Amino acid sequence: MRILSILALALAALILASTTTAAAGAPVIKYRDDQFGSVLATPKKQALYYWRVEKRAGGKIRCTGSCAKAWPPLYAKGAVPRKMRGIAGTFGTIRRPDGRRQVTFNGLAIYTYAHEGPTQVLCNNVNGWFVVRVR
């Protein structure tokens, strides 16, 4: 019976590892969304977005004030690794106008949407916001 319990736990861990990828303490994970494929998310599985306005501005922060209330920035807590296992792309940080450091992915600041819950992607291609898809 104990061996069966251990096997069940190992299988559950393997399934979880195949659907999310992150280094311990990493600010983001990768998870599989039925509609959008592999997307970046917070460790609580809240989808991450970039804003086309900032992409066109060469990565400069444009989402401040009421924009940042609706689209909360993903702030860096400590060092952010440039690479994360299982995620093709480069991470970094950018200094926001308020002086705080925000996480970037491939040079673009990344945000959550305040009105989404875990595993929801409600605002892809809405007003220039796009979920961050990864390989």
Segments the model singles out, each with a brief description of its role:
Residues M1-A8:
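Bacterial N-terminal signal peptides that target proteins for export
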Residues L14-A22:
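C-terminal segment of classical bacterial N-terminal signal peptides
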Residues L4, A22-R135:
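Compact beta-sheet-dominated domain cores in extracellular/mature segments
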